UniProtKB/Swiss-Prot annotation:
Active-site residues, record numbering mapped to chain: D109, H442, D489, E498
Protein name: Endoglucanase 10
Membrane-spanning residues: none
InterPro entries: 6-hairpin_glycosidase_sf, 6hp_glycosidase-like_sf, Glyco_hydro_9, Glyco_hydro_9_His_AS
Organism: Arabidopsis thaliana (Mouse-ear cress)
Reaction equations catalysed: Endohydrolysis of (1->4)-beta-D-glucosidic linkages in cellulose, lichenin and cereal beta-D-glucans
Keyword Glycoprotein: yes
A Pfam short name: Glyco_hydro_9
Keywords: Carbohydrate metabolism, Cell wall biogenesis/degradation, Cellulose degradation, Glycoprotein, Glycosidase, Hydrolase, Polysaccharide degradation, Secreted, Signal
Location in the cell: Secreted
Primary enzyme class: hydrolase
Homology family: Belongs to the glycosyl hydrolase 9 (cellulase E) family.
Coiled coil (residue ranges): none
């Protein structure tokens, strides 16, 4: 749990099929992908092909990254693939006659924090929508969709009426003094909710984004479920917008863990996803009309569970790359210009390159969970690069200096490679990947033998053990190194050695973007 004082796949939304050398047929809400228009950076290059050769390194890491979601599942487990996990949290929600047994434990503890869990679902949806063909090429699409549905099943139950959303199961004050397996929990699991008297705009809007994006994922395979998700998304967005108020102001207890710095970004993010899911121009007008109020145009930001602006700007850029009819939405250009500024900040040789970078090349912003910005930045860079290439735009200008779209992809790969072991420490930060990775991950279930029965306190003998975790939390992306590229592998070091589901969702998106090659990128080398 975070304490805060602390495509190159061309499937998903757009499956590019080369029929003639100069013709692209793509499925983007039944509209053809557009080619270069006057004023674009540069165009006329080769067009993308279907997934190509598989990069085993990223394919292996992707399989592991998705496995971490199985490790984090609450509820009655179905087709359980993790031998040291079992059913848990079966009575969650019962005090209000709800079934909140599903969902994911947020990190190494056993709280279900709705705000970052919804963000996890939104990012997983985005990853599937853009890179579903990549995932499918390495047999990981079904596991990704299964994990997403485990979350959205929970979110549906957590929204029992239009203006009520349960946003947390468990109390950190009760949970955190314990060290035990989730299967053995006997402590009370109190519920926290938002409603008209206690609004929480950011968590309601993020949950709306999660449900709207997931409705697209399941639109073809389960249209009834998709329609249910979309109905909830619309209700939650209306609740978020009409009953504005910060959840971390109205519920001060959350401030120590997932404190929000504002809700404007979530409103824009949710409206953007609802437009993609519905093509209802009302939502497009919303992001256009509220851009000056909430979007911080011209000021690049870091994409995270707390700040969705950079993600929103990239997502809305997608419309300008591919959508034909966007009449009356003049404000979208500001979103794409700011997205470009974000990209220019990430390119190492750009005149506006960020200084928030280690000597080894890792994007580094904060000591706590340092890799969140690394993986989120790399994911957005992959997306933007792929949007450019699919649109036959292969250059971007950063203060007059020209960079290729493939250089954004190279940046994304550099971050992924660092996480997988190409770094000064020679260690992988993805548990189970490579020959050297963290052995003492701050994770209760991983640290306690599956056949041990512990209470709240006696489990600390496993926390204090000098032996490595008896269970391997396969696929977990831990917090990451300090700026000086030091890392302490210890259970007592959650700042660096605790994994989170939202980091793993971003990692899944990043690895899915890199898992195969295509004719386009090969031809641009």
């Amino acid at each position: 749990m975070e304490e805060k004082s602390k495509s190159r796949g061309w499937c998903g939304w757009f499956i590019a099929i080369i029929v003639l050398a100069s013709v692209i047929l793509a499925v983007v809400y039944t509209v053809k992908l557009r080619t270069k228009k006057s004023g674009d950076d540069d165009g006329g290059g080769p067009v993308p092909g279907p997934p190509g050769a598989i990069d085993k390194k990223y394919a292996d890491a992707l399989k592991l990254a998705l496995q971490f979601f199985d490790i984090q599942k609450s509820g009655k487990l179905e087709n359980n693939k993790i031998p040291w996990r079992g059913d848990s949290g079966l009575k969650d929600g019962s005090e209000d006659n709800l079934d909140l047994s599903k969902g994911l434990y947020d990190a190494g503890d056993h709280i279900k924090f709705g705000f970052p869990m919804a963000f996890t679902a939104t990012v997983l949806s985005w990853s599937i929508l853009e890179y579903g063909d990549q995932m499918n090429a390495v047999n990981q699409l079904d596991p990704a969709k299964d994990s997403l549905r485990w979350i959205t099943d929970y979110l549906i139950k957590a929204h029992p009426s239009d203006n009520v959303l349960y946003i947390q199961v468990g109390d950190p004050k009760v949970d955190h003094p314990c060290w035990e397996r989730p299967e053995d929990m006997k402590e009370k699991r109190p519920l926290t909710k938002i409603d008209v008297d206690t609004p929480g705009t950011e968590v309601a809007a993020e949950t709306a984004a999660a449900m709207a994006s997931a409705s697209l994922v399941f639109k073809d395979s389960d249209p009834t479920y998709s329609a249910t998700l979309l109905k909830h998304a619309k209700q939650l967005f209306n609740f978020a917008d009409t009953k504005r108020g910060s959840y971390s102001v109205n519920i001060p207890e959350v401030q120590k863990f997932y404190n929000s710095t504002g809700y404007g970004d979530e409103l824009l993010w949710a409206a953007s996803w609802l437009y993609h899911a519905t093509e209802d121009k009302t939502y497009l007008d919303y992001v256009s009309n509220h851009g000056k109020e909430f979007a911080s145009f011209g000021n690049p930001t870091w994409f995270s569970w707390d700040n969705k602006l950079a993600g929103t700007q990239v997502l809305l850029s997608r419309l300008l790359f591919f959508k034909k009819d966007l009449s009356g939405s003049k404000g979208l250009g500001n979103y794409r210009n700011t997205a470009k500024a974000v990209m220019c900040g990430l390119l190492p040789k750009s005149p506006t390159s960020t200084a928030s970078r280690t000597n080894g090349g890792l994007i580094w912003v904060s000591e706590w969970n340092s890799m969140q910005q690394s993986v989120s930045s790399a994911f957005l860079a992959s997306l933007f690069s792929d949007y450019m290439l699919t649109s036959r735009i292969h250059k971007i200008s950063c203060d007059g200096k020209i960079f290729k779209a493939t250089e954004l992809r190279d940046f994304a790969k550099s971050q992924a490679d660092y996480m997988l072991g190409k770094n000064p420490l020679g260690t992988s930060f993805v548990v189970g990947y490579g020959d050297k990775y963290p052995q003492f991950v701050h994770h209760r279930g991983a640290s306690i033998p599956a056949d041990a029965t512990t209470g709240c306190l006696d489990g600390f003998k496993w926390f204090n053990s000098t032996k490595p975790n008896p269970n391997i939390a396969y696929g977990a992306l831990v917090g990451g190194p300090f700026f000086n590229e030091t890392f302490t592998d210890s259970r007592e070091n959650p700042m660096q050695n605790e994994p989170t589901t939202y980091n793993n969702a971003l990692l899944v998106g990043l690895l899915s973007s890199l898992v195969t090659t295509s004719s386009t990128l090969q031809s641009l080398k």
